[in-house]
UniProtKB/Swiss-Prot annotation:
Disulfide bonds: none
Active site residues according to the UniProt entry: K167 (proton acceptor), H288 (proton acceptor)
Keywords: Calvin cycle, Carbon dioxide fixation, Lyase, Magnesium, Metal-binding, Monooxygenase, Oxidoreductase, Photosynthesis
Annotated organism of origin: Rhodopseudomonas palustris (strain ATCC BAA-98 / CGA009)
UniProt protein name: Ribulose bisphosphate carboxylase
Note: The basic functional RuBisCO is composed of a large chain homodimer in a 'head-to-tail' conformation. In contrast to form I RuBisCO, the form II RuBisCO are composed solely of large subunits.
E.C. number(s) listed in UniProt: 4.1.1.39
Length: 461
């Protein structure tokens, strides 16, 4: 059935839709399936299934219903682009407080339309949120400023937070795990649970929490510096998340503000993120995106992009989210992914298709991880243009030939090297831990700094 007369209006102007402030705008790359309708017909069916319509006319439709139709307002068939305007009245709101929910946004904009028989593929690349809808989202309650404050740094441009993930990701019992934390904290700032770590039979949750709390106290006493830990509280059950969070805060007591809560936001979903955001508003909310590549990967033509995921995370209230390594680590990505970091940290930023004003909503910190080490960092910082972020290097710290503490120091020295604009090989001559990173990661060293062996003369540990 051709629904383009109802669900498409190419006379609508994007500037007027934005000025009107009553529509969420979404940009998709879409391909119709052969043997069905043409591009505009398929786009209109997509808009219908995403809002008030179905594949047939129904007798219950009235004039009010037609007034909240989603409308295709722009198409570029040559580039497979379609843009759809969704009236904000379509989106579900909480009964308890009238707030918006990402679950509803996803259900409409990326729900049934992903399985339509006449669509070969469709993927969301950007979306725009008008002020009237933006203000209904929680946004972050804490930011990197709160971590900088705990670390005793300035809350403006407080700088690089040196972090790690304890490796191996699974298989350590509570005390060996805590010992690894202590070792890293002698040189670094921030440790996170790897996303599968929780309450395994060989590492009971409460035993691990107690051991890490003791390691933090000892590391702080030894170094005279504050330390940070991000605990995974992800669970299927809302009450389990609350129980984990409350036990952690009770155990860390005076160090409770040194604790972030990690939630696997993609696999556990918006409900888990919002549970943590609302139940623990004083804690830094660490959004881990494990599993996201199933839909965000450039190889996937359905779903949405990592840019869209990160933008949604800011709306939900994530204090920080993993944003990949922009092509400098082991995960998929490219240098242009820095647009993700800009969108979640700035008060106004341009996406692939839309300009977004955040109207003072707190920023979300880029958390960089995935195959990073000290040698890759100067180029990464060059690409991004600043170092006000958290980096969690697992292998990059514990793969250092001199251990976790030296690995942490090498990461910090890498940022110092970049800030000074120094040649990394020359800088390494006076910074032992950074120099030993060349020996720790020789394949990276050979690729990035081909002359390093002659200048640094590798030595046995």
């Amino acid at each position: 059935m051709d629904q383009s007369n109802r669900y498409a209006n190419l006379n609508l102007k994007e500037s007027e839709l934005i000025a009107g402030g009553r529509h969420v705008l979404c940009a998709y790359i879409m391909k119709p399936k052969a043997g069905f309708g043409n591009f505009i017909q398929t786009a209109a069916h997509f808009a219908a299934e995403s809002s008030t319509g179905t594949n047939v006319e129904v007798s219950t439709t009235d004039d009010f219903t037609r007034g909240v139709d989603a409308l295709v307002y722009e198409v570029d068939e040559a580039n497979s682009l379609m843009k759809i305007a969704y009236p904000i009245e379509l989106f579900d709101r909480n009964v308890i407080d009238g707030r918006a929910m990402i679950a509803s946004f996803l259900t409409l904009t990326i729900g049934n339309n992903q399985g339509m028989g006449d669509v070969e593929y469709a993927k969301m690349y950007d979306f725009y949120v008008p002020p009237a809808y933006l203000k209904l989202f929680d946004g972050p309650s804490t930011t990197i400023k709160d971590l900088w404050r705990v670390l005793g740094r300035p809350v403006i441009n407080g700088g690089f937070i040196v972090g790690t993930i304890i490796k191996p990701k699974l298989g350590l019992r509570p005390q060996p795990f805590a010992n690894a934390c202590y070792d890293f904290w002698l040189g670094g700032d921030f440790i996170k649970n790897d996303e599968p770590q929780g309450n395994q039979v060989f590492a009971p949750f409460k035993d691990t929490v107690r051991a890490v709390a003791d390691a933090m106290r000892r590391a702080q006493d030894k170094t005279g510096e504050a330390k940070l830990f991000s605990f995974n509280i992800t669970a299927d059950d809302h009450y389990e998340m609350l129980a984990r969070g409350e036990f952690i805060l009770e155990t860390f007591a005076d160090n409770a503000d040194h604790i972030a809560f990690l939630v696997d936001g993609y696999v556990a979903g918006p409900a888990a993120v919002t549970t943590a955001r609302r139940a623990f508003p004083k804690q830094y909310l660490h959004y881990h995106r494990a599993g996201h590549g199933a839909v965000t990967s450039p190889q996937s033509k359905r779903g949405y992009t990592a840019f869209v995921l990160s933008k949604m995370a800011r709306l939900q209230g994530a204090s920080g989210i993993h944003t990949g390594t922009m092509g400098f680590g082991k995960m998929e990505g490219e240098a242009a992914d820095r647009a993700i970091a800009y969108m979640i940290t700035e008060d106004a930023a341009d996406g692939p298709y839309f300009h977004q004003e955040w109207l003072g909503m707190n920023p979300t910190t880029p958390i960089i991880s995935g195959g990073m080490n000290a040698l890759r960092m100067p180029g990464f910082f060059d690409n991004l243009g600043h170092s006000n972020l958290i980096m969690t290097a697992g292998g990059g710290a514990f793969g250092h030939v001199d251990g976790g503490a030296a690995g942490a120091k090498s990461l910090r020295q890498a940022e110092q090297c970049w800030k000074q604009g120094a040649d990394p090989v020359e800088f390494a001559k006076d910074h032992r831990e950074f120099a030993r990173a060349f020996e720790s990661f020789p394949q990276d060293a050979d690729k990035l700094y081909p002359n390093w062996r002659a200048k640094l003369k590798p030595q046995a540990a």
